[in-house]
């Protein structure tokens, strides 16, 4: 027998699904794996916007390293000029002539080192201060109004037109506000600056828009229910506890499904989905020398591959050797400072690429294994669901064949280890908080919706009889915050009473592992009951609503029993 887990798997095996977060958690197992692997906050955000596969993690790591390589090579070139005054004099001899070379990043850096204005590939001259202001102003303009860059054809933007847009928006900063702002990397064009801003700030802007939208939607919904409760609504929203967050997320889903009244939704603007669209890497424009004047052709000795540089007591063959060495050592701590010595400059990037492949091939499964073992050793509900599969193979059908095999094999190894050692001891289950464990959080969420559907066509007394429950009390306590989150903001009170009574009757004081095993096997047994086998019984219970009853596995099993 095989238990198959997919991206859509829910109760009762949902806790084994690595693409769904645990109750009240923010990230999934694969998202946590990606975040653990990546270094920078921007890299972690970019990973969360995708599927977090191993291939995608490698792509984002390359983006992280691209920034490191650019900064490290510029740092090393600066040090090379400081260590060789004749090179510094050679650069200074260019005077104010435009610097010309195929690598615009090098052109921008040499121009800044020379201490004069920046010549953009568009032929416009900007001072260092003006470039900082433009970059800072573009960021502020985009954050305050994302449409300023999303609604225009950025491919047509020049530095001059971008400056005009920033000034018109009122976001042109003062000199003091930009003193610590870095100059954007070359190519310094209107396209590159605007694309850089969109790429680096879209994720945070989207998160802010999403939070503001859901908060506004919640406030409108609550005030529509009780216009006089403005103070209570304000207090509730300002606290934003687990129950309120669950209600907010539920309302957002209903909004997107078109289930909310127009009185609540009119005028509300949802987060701009364009902020989640992947950015294509703009092509690097070539810097051409002006046709009507002299220019400074960069000699090889002033390039990133131009000659040796001493950094931290080691002499690297070129600034590029230093940069790639730094990137590789960030992955492999035992990679020596001299391990790229005498390697031709054309081969250092090849070695880096090979090392990155080795690193991601080793790091991804190692990190996934560590986090998965922590998940099952630290969460008894997850372990209980895994052990409830008994002798069956647990197979994860993932996004790639490699991932499918990897996760399936890991869950099998973890399961085998725990079967040998035996499950840990657990505290008796308590009705003081039915959803106190992650499994029964899912149980409450699933059962409350199932019973609410059944109660549309049969009475509470009939449902209790089917479930072999004693009389259900007319009143039970209010749900805790965690129970409320599991039930959802639109839960049916009578269904909550049935769930509460069933938990007290069947699970109060029982062992978690035994209870989970019972629930999982009962659900699997229910799935095997055919609709035809209980149609007659269902019709006697509800002649008009029998179709609803036979569609519910739990109710089919109850009628069969």
Swiss-Prot record:
Looking at the Swiss-Prot or TrEMBL record, what is one Pfam family this protein matches? DUF5876
Listed InterPro entries: DUF5876
Q: What's the protein here called?
A: Uncharacterized protein 051R
Source organism per entry reads Frog virus 3 (isolate Goorha) (FV-3)
Q: What is the lineage of its organism?
A: Viruses, Varidnaviria, Bamfordvirae, Nucleocytoviricota, Megaviricetes
């Amino acid at each position: 027998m095989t238990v198959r887990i997919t991206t859509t798997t829910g109760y009762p095996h949902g806790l084994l699904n690595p693409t769904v977060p645990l109750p009240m958690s923010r990230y999934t197992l694969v998202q946590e794996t990606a975040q653990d692997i990546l270094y920078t906050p921007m890299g972690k955000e970019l990973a969360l916007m995708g599927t977090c596969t191993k291939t995608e993690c490698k792509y984002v790591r390359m983006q992280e390293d691209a920034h490191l390589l650019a900064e490290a090579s510029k740092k090393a070139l600066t040090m090379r000029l400081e260590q060789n005054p004749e090179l510094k004099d050679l650069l200074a001899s260019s005077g104010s002539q435009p610097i010309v070379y195929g690598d615009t990043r090098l052109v921008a850096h040499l121009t800044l080192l020379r201490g004069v204005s920046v010549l953009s590939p568009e032929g416009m001259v900007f001072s260092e201060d003006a470039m900082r202001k433009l970059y800072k102003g573009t960021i502020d303009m985009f954050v305050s109004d994302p449409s300023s860059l999303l609604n225009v054809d950025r491919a047509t933007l020049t530095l001059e037109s971008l400056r005009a847009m920033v000034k018109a928006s009122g976001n042109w900063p003062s000199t003091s506000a930009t003193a610590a702002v870095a100059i954007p990397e070359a190519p310094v064009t209107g396209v590159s600056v605007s694309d850089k801003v969109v790429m680096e700030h879209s994720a945070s802007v989207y998160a802010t828009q999403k939070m503001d939208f859901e908060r506004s939607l919640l406030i409108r919904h609550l005030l529509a229910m009780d216009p006089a409760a403005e103070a209570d609504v304000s207090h509730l929203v300002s606290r934003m506890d687990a129950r309120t967050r669950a209600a907010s997320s539920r309302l957002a889903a209903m909004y997107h499904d078109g289930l909310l009244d127009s009185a609540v939704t009119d005028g509300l603007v949802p987060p701009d989905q364009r902020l989640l669209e992947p950015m294509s890497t703009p092509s690097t424009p070539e810097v051409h020398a002006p046709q009507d004047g002299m220019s400074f052709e960069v000699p090889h000795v002033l390039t990133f591959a131009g000659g040796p540089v001493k950094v931290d007591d080691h002499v690297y063959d070129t600034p590029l050797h230093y940069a790639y060495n730094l990137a590789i050592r960030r992955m492999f701590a035992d990679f020596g400072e001299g391990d790229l010595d005498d390697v031709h400059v054309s081969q250092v990037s090849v070695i880096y690429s090979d090392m990155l492949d080795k690193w991601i091939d080793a790091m991804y499964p190692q990190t996934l294994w560590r986090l998965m073992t922590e998940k099952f050793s630290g969460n008894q509900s997850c372990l209980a669901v895994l052990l409830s599969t008994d002798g069956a193979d647990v197979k994860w059908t993932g996004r790639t064949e490699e991932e499918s095999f990897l996760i399936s094999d890991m869950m099998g190894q973890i399961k085998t280890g725990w079967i040998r050692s035996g499950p840990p001891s657990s505290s008796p289950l308590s009705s003081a908080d039915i959803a106190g464990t992650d499994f029964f959080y899912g149980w409450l969420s699933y059962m409350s919706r199932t019973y609410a559907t059944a109660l549309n066509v049969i009475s509470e007394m009939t449902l209790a009889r089917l479930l072999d429950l004693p009389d259900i009390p007319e009143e039970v306590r209010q749900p805790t915050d965690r129970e409320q989150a599991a039930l959802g903001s639109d839960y049916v009170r009578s269904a909550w009473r049935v769930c509460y009574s069933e938990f007290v009757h069947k699970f109060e004081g029982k062992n978690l592992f035994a209870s989970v095993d019972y629930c999982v096997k009962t659900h699997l047994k229910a799935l095997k009951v055919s609709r035809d086998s209980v149609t007659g019984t269902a019709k006697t219970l509800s002649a008009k609503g029998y179709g609803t009853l036979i569609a519910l596995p739990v109710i089919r099993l109850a009628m069969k029993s």
